[in-house]
Amino acid sequence: MTDSVRSYLRSLLPAAATLLAAGSLTAAEAVQPARGPFWSGTIMRSKSEAAAMKGLAVTLGNEGRSYVVYDLDTMRLAAAWTGEFLEFGNTLTKIEWPPPPTVKGTNIVFDSKLGPGWADKAGSLADPRTGTQGPLPKDWAHYSGLYVHDDRVVLSYTVGTTPVLELPGFVNASGQPIFARTLQFPKGAQNLTVLLADGISGAVATDFVGDQAGPVTVSFKDGRSLTIGGSGLPKGSRLESTPEGKLVVKLAKLAKNDSVRLLFSSEANPGGFFAVSQKKPLDLRPYTEGGGVHWPEDVTTVGKVGTEEGPYQVDTITEPFPNPYNVSTFFGGFDFLPDGRAAICTFHGDVWVVSGLDDKLEKLTWKRFATGLFQPLGLKVVKGDIYVAGRDQITRLKDVNKDGEADFYENFNNDTVVTPNYHEFVLDLHTDSKGNFYYAKGAPWEPSVSSPHQGTILKVTPDGKKMEVFASGLRAPNGMTVGPDDTVLVGDNQGHWMPSSKLNLVKPGAFMGMTPAAQKSLTLRYTNGTEIVGNPSDPEFRKANKLKGWDSAMPIPVSYDEPIAWVPMRWDNSSGGQVYVTSDKWGPWKGAPLFMSYGKCLLYGVMTEKVGDTTQAALVPFGLKFASGVMRGRFSSKDGQLYLAGLKGWQNAASRDGGFYRVRYTGKPVTMPVKTRTGKNGIQLTFATELDAKSAEDVQSYAVELWNYKYSGAYGSPEFSVKTPGKQGHDKLEVKSAKLSADKKTLLLEVDGLEVANQYSVKYSLTAANGAEVRSEVIGTIHKLGPELSATR
C-alpha cells in the first residue's frame, strides 16, 4: 500500500484505519465500509431531482471531505461539494428499499442540470435524448471507462472523435477551497465546448486563455457565486454563458497531449487561483498505468465440507466476513477464471477473487479485486477477462499493472437506460456461442414503466458496441441462463401480472406477460370484450386509457408467451437463476437445466418435454437447503461440480447475508426422477435408479392434482380448479393404474381426467430396488397432452 493510499483511507475512515492497522474488525458495526476513491449509482440532488442517473461520485482531497459527481450518460460534471458525502441510510451494509442516495453536504459549490456535458459538433448543448434518459449518441460524447491510481480517478471518454482524459481534484490554497478539472487530449482537440455550471445569472463573455486565465466571478440565480480560473488554456479560448444560463468554456485548438486545468471556488480570492496556477497542468498518462494496492490484506477463511448422506453434498465456501474493510458480502454473481479461481461480485459494489477451491476447502484466500460498482448482480469471465453487469453498464475489469487489483474499469456497454426506481435491478450475465452477452432488467415498483428497458432481457454484441431488447414482459427476473445450444431461460416471481413464479423459455421478441413492461404494442381486452391497441409501456397510452398497470380490473393481453413451467408459491415465492448441467461428473442430470429458488433457498431439477412444437416442463426438488437465497450457478471445469451463490434480501428464507456453495456429486445412487412425459392417458416418470415393483405398482403410492392460475393485473393469483373454473382449490385425480417398465426405472401412471392445466402435482412414496425410501413430489405444466404413453422406454 502506498503512502497516498494509506493517507487516503485514513482520512476517509478514521475508525476503520485503526482497525486496518490492527488487522481485525472487532467493532465492525461501528464503522462505515471502506468504499474506495469512487462510488457508482444513481445520485439525487434532492428527493425529487436527480443529479445523475449513472452517477460517478469521486472523493477528492480535503481529508476526504470534497466530492464531485459525474453523469456518465452525458459526460457532465453534475455537482461539486464539500462536507458530508451522500445520505445512504443503511444501503451500504444492507439490502433495503429506500430511494437512491442524495447529496448530503450542504456546501454545493457548483452544479448542472441533466443534459450534455459537452456541446455537439455544431456547438449545441440541447439535449437530444427522449425524456433526458440514457446515454448521448456515441458520436456526441461517450464514456470509455476510468483508471484508478492511488487516490486519483482519471476518466476516459470521447467528445465526437476526440479522446479526453479527465482528472478531478481539490486543492486547499491557504484556506481557499478550489476544485479542479484537468483535461488532457491525447490526440489534440479543436473547437470543443465544455459545460461548467448551470443557473448563471446575467451574461458572461470573455477571453479565457493562458496559464492564469481569470479568475472570473459569476453569480447564480439562487444567490450563490462561483469564481472560475484556469491554466494551460490555448489562445482563442472563451468563457461564456448561454441564454439558458449555462456557463461554458470554448476551447480553441489544442496540440497532441496538451492538458488544461479549470479551477472553481466559492471564494473570489485571486491569490488562491494564482498559487494553484503556478503548477503546470498534470500529464495524466502516467495515471493510466496502475498505481499502488488499495486492499493489501487478503482474507483467509475455512470452508465446510458437507457430511450428509445422499448423492449430493453441499460444501460451504465461507465468505470473507468479517474483513478489514468492513464491507458486506451479499453475493450477486460469479464465474471461474482459467486457473480455477472464482471471481464473485457483491450487491454493494465489490468484486472478490477466491482461491483454494480444492477438495478440502481448508484455506480459502479472498482478494478484494474491485470496488465502487453500481449494484452488480451478474458476472461473466470471457477469455480471462472479468465482465460485471451493474445497473449502469457492463464493466470489463483490467489489472493494468498485474498487482491483483483492477486499475481500469472499462465501459464495455452502457446503452441501457437507468431511472431512480429501486426495483429495476440488472440481473445475471451470460454469453451465447457467438459471444453475445445477455442480462435481465427488472420492471419498476410501482409498475409504472418509464423507460424502454425496464422488464426486459437485453442482448449486447460481442464487441460491446450495440445493445438491443431481446425479450420483454418481465417483472423481477432474478436470474437466467443461456444453454449450450443457445437456449435462453429466465425465471420470474409472483406479483402483478405474475400469477405465480415461473420458468420461461425465451425466443427473440417474446412478451412474457408483465403487461406494463411489454415495450411494444399489444391488443388488450376488457372483461366485457372491448379491445384497445397500444403500448402499455408508454405513459401517454396508459394515461389516455386510464390504465393503472396493476389493477385486477385492467384489460389483459389477448396472448402472451406462456412459461414452460409454473412454480407454486410453496415451492418458490421468488425465483433465482438457472444453470444447465454441462459436467460428466455430476450424476444423471447432464444436459438438463436446474432451477434455483432465491426465496426458498432451494434447488430443483428441470425435466423438459416437447409435444409437437410446444415445450413444457416439470420440476423435482433436490432436497438440499442453503443458508442464502441461491440465484446464480456455474459448473467448474476443474472439478466438474456445481457452484451456487446468493444473498439474503426481502422475501426470502435466508439466514446469511451472502453464501457461496459447492454442490458435489458423491457417486451414491440418485433416486430422483430425471424425465417426465404427459400423454392422453397419464403421466410417465423415469427415475435415475431402479424401483421396487411392489411399491411402484401400488396406486396408493401416488397422489395427483391439477390446478390453474388467473392471469391479471392483480398481485399473484389464488389456485383454481381446472374442472370447475372460478372455484378455488385443486382437482384430485384418480390414479387408475401404475406400471413399471422392464428396466424398473420408468413408471406409467394411468390418470383419469388428466388435461391441460397450468399446474399438476404428483406426490409419490416409493421404495428403490435397493430398499431406499423414494419420497418426493413432481410439479409441472401441461400446455398440450402428447399421445398415449406406455411403460416401455
Q: Positions of the model-derived regions?
A:
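Beta-strand-rich N-terminal accessory domains
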Residues: 27-180, 191-217
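N-terminal pre-domain segments of enzymes
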Residues: 27-56, 267-315, 786-793
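Short, hydrophobic/aromatic-enriched beta-strand segments in well-ordered soluble domains
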Residues: 155-159, 181-185, 192-198, 245, ...
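Structural beta-strand segments of beta-rich domains
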Residues: 179-181, 681-685, 747
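Extended acidic/polar, glycine-enriched regions
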Residues: 219-295
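Beta-propeller domains with acidic blade repeats across secreted/periplasmic ectodomains
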Residues: 276-670, 693
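Acidic, Ser/Thr/Gly/Pro-rich low-complexity segments and short DxT(G/T)-type signature motifs
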Residues: 277, 283, 667-673, 692, ...
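Short, surface-exposed alpha-helix to beta-strand junction/turn motifs within ectodomains of secreted
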Residues: 690-736, 762-768, 776-780
